[in-house]
Amino acid sequence: SLRSVIHFTPTDFEMLYLRSDLYENDREQARKAKRSFVDNERLGFDSKETYRGLETDPDSEPDIGTYEFTIRVFSEGFISRVIVGDQGIILTTDGLDLASFETVAIALRVLLKEL
């Protein structure tokens, strides 16, 4: 199930959702804890440019397609990141199957494009 939703840019972030049983529902404590995740996921702004360049590089992995989203797997949950332009969304979850991650990522990409 969904644990948290964070909107972020290269310079700031906002927690849009926090499941009530986490961090004793203390949003400030959660924000402090999530800062390290956000700082790490901001690296995606740079790596996205790298992956975009690989799309046109004839020496890169053939037919790998366009970068869409990132999933990080932990023993007790997942972090998923979607970046469009200069903003992104991080989701933390207890678990989802891969098809559900992809469905959510597509929806988030559409939403971010509209912002």
Describe each region flagged by the PLM.
Residues 1-115:
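Non-catalytic interaction/Regulatory regions outside core domains
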